[in-house]
């Protein structure tokens, strides 16, 4: 259920600060969002899969921590990323 390599490369290319950037918070949040979005339909079909749900909650909390860090460091970048990923209604 991992995000495909081609999709990962596309996400990294769209959100990277420089050519070889894979570790910036923007890239990490975007990759986590893609993984979370891929797992969400699984839990609608498999409501009793608590072990995988625990992993999903860890990903969500990691994304939340990265977003909090980004909000403290660069508010404009944070707002642009939230808008781009559609995380807030």
Swiss-Prot record:
Keywords from the UniProt entry: Ribonucleoprotein, Ribosomal protein, RNA-binding, rRNA-binding
GO molecular-function term, one example from the UniProt record: rRNA binding
Protein origin, superkingdom: Bacteria
One of the Pfam families matching this protein, by short name: Ribosomal_S15
Keyword Plastid among UniProt keywords: no
GO biological process, one term: translation
Keyword rRNA-binding belongs to the record: yes
Gene Ontology CC entries for this record: cytosolic small ribosomal subunit
Summary of the function given for this chain in its UniProt record: One of the primary rRNA binding proteins, it binds directly to 16S rRNA where it helps nucleate assembly of the platform of the 30S subunit by binding and bridging several RNA helices of the 16S rRNA.
Similarity section: Belongs to the universal ribosomal protein uS15 family.
Record HAMAP family: Ribosomal_uS15_B
Known partners and oligomeric status: Part of the 30S ribosomal subunit. Forms a bridge to the 50S subunit in the 70S ribosome, contacting the 23S rRNA.
Protein name: Small ribosomal subunit protein uS15
Organism field: Polynucleobacter necessarius subsp. necessarius (strain STIR1)
Biological classification of the source: Bacteria, Pseudomonadati, Pseudomonadota, Betaproteobacteria, Burkholderiales
Name of encoding gene: rpsO
